């Protein structure tokens, strides 16, 4: 094993604010060049905190006798690197890491065949820890885990512990946390469920939501969002529109979105559990769905659509669907696929706003946002 104490901390100790700005400037130049052919306006650049910006982290666990450590695999060499501190992750995760290991070490039943620990933290102070095992978890494990959770809570951690094994999930309390985001002077509440997608960089998420609010301010008509997840964007944007329709297919995400709608007092947003293809058929009157009983689609005038697709971007059919709307708000975690989609969308729409969000500092990855308006004539 490659014993690199505080691997993350040592590598970041040499980084300066100038180093952060240099990597951000390189991304600015790269994104500007990538979209030069679409004649966008000046790029709006949103910087991230240089450390403690990632709200979730996953670590493999390395065992040496009765001891155990967090570790990661070096991408280039596949070496196992011991991680005692991880400045990329939130301060809360870093505070909990050594305390959690200290609580695990004395208990063989908690250590045995433990191979991974996942953390999901929040700015609100709540955190979920998932312990992953290569064995079935018995009553003895649950009893020891409940004691560990109580000990950690007594030390001041607002923690929920979860045990996972093959076809097994044991929750010692809730399997979600409640996050608080400050967006354009307003506090928004979001339920985030363990093992479901959430935006990894809370500070950048707040900036993305604020930017999306700004670019859609003064919008007329209604908003449609495809695959809304837990309602992260729809809930923030609802104040700018008469009504909002959002689609999502994953039931846990739909349930979280419904919770978040109520928690934030939003009264003009409806979540539909259906795919983009099904929604398109329903809007065009090609098929009826029982799930739409009580929803009058004809009362909606959705002239703005919001999409935040996975790294693969939008498929051809969805690009054509999106192209039917006058205003398109597109957040992309892969500017290369956004550029490919823009080759089609750019035939009918022009870029009105253009943004870079440094969601993943110190990596080559970029998050981009474009607000497109239909060309005149």
UniProtKB/Swiss-Prot annotation:
GO biological process, one term: tRNA methylation
Record-linked Gene3D superfamilies: 2.40.50.1070, Vaccinia Virus protein VP39
Superkingdom field: Bacteria
Protein name: tRNA/tmRNA (uracil-C(5))-methyltransferase
NCBIfam families according to UniProt: trmA_only
GO molecular function: rRNA binding; tRNA (uracil(54)-C5)-methyltransferase activity, S-adenosyl methionine-dependent; tRNA binding
EC number(s) per entry: 2.1.1.-, 2.1.1.35
Taxonomic source organism: Aeromonas salmonicida (strain A449)
Function: Dual-specificity methyltransferase that catalyzes the formation of 5-methyluridine at position 54 (m5U54) in all tRNAs, and that of position 341 (m5U341) in tmRNA (transfer-mRNA).
First-tier enzyme category under EC: transferase
Catalyzed reactions: uridine(54) in tRNA + S-adenosyl-L-methionine = 5-methyluridine(54) in tRNA + S-adenosyl-L-homocysteine + H(+); uridine(341) in tmRNA + S-adenosyl-L-methionine = 5-methyluridine(341) in tmRNA + S-adenosyl-L-homocysteine + H(+)
Annotated active site: 333, 367
Stated family: Belongs to the class I-like SAM-binding methyltransferase superfamily. RNA M5U methyltransferase family. TrmA subfamily.
Residues reported in the UniProt entry to bind S-adenosyl-L-methionine: 199, 227, 232, 248, 308
PROSITE patterns for the chain: SAM_MT_RNA_M5U, TRMA_1, TRMA_2
Alphabetically ordered keywords of this record: Methyltransferase, S-adenosyl-L-methionine, Transferase, tRNA processing
GO CC annotation: cytosol
InterPro entries: MeTrfase_TrmA_AS, MeTrfase_TrmA_CS, SAM-dependent_MTases_sf, TrmA_MeTrfase, U5_MeTrfase_fam
């Amino acid at each position: 094993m490659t014993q690199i104490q505080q691997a993350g901390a040592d590598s970041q100790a040499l980084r300066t604010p100038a180093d952060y700005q240099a990597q951000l400037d390189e991304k600015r130049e790269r994104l500007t060049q990538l979209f030069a052919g679409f004649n966008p306006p000046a790029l709006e650049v949103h910087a991230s905190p240089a450390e403690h910006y990632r709200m979730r982290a996953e670590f493999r666990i390395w065992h040496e006798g009765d001891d155990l450590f967090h570790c990661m695999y070096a991408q280039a060499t596949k070496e196992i690197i011991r991680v005692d501190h991880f400045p990329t992750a939130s301060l809360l995760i870093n505070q909990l890491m050594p305390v959690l290991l200290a609580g695990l070490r004395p208990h063989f039943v908690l250590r045995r065949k433990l191979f991974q620990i996942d953390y999901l933290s929040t700015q609100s102070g709540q955190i979920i820890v998932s312990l992953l095992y290569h064995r079935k978890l018995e009553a003895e494990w649950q009893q020891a885990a409940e004691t560990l959770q109580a000990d950690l809570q007594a030390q001041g951690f607002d923690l929920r512990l979860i045990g996972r094994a093959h076809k097994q999930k044991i929750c010692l309390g809730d399997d979600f946390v409640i996050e608080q985001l400050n967006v354009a002077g307003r506090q928004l509440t979001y339920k985030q469920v363990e093992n479901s997608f959430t935006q990894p960089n809370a500070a950048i998420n707040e900036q993305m939501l604020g930017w999306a609010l700004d670019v859609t301010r003064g919008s007329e008509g209604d908003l449609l969002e495809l695959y809304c997840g837990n309602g992260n964007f729809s809930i923030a944007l609802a104040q700018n529109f008469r009504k909002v329709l959002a689609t999502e297919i994953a039931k846990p995400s739909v349930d979280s979105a419904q919770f978040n709608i109520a928690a934030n007092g939003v009264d003009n947003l409806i979540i539909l559990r259906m795919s983009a293809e099904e929604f398109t058929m329903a809007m065009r009157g090609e098929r009826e769905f029982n799930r739409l009983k009580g929803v009058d689609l004809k009362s909606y005038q959705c002239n703005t659509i919001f999409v935040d697709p996975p790294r693969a971007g939008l498929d051809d059919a969805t690009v054509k669907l999106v192209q039917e709307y006058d205003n398109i708000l597109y957040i992309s975690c892969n500017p290369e696929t956004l550029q490919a989609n823009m080759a089609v969308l750019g035939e009918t729409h022009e870029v009105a706003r253009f943004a870079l969000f440094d969601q993943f500092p110190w990596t080559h990855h970029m998050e981009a946002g474009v607000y497109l308006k239909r060309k005149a004539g």
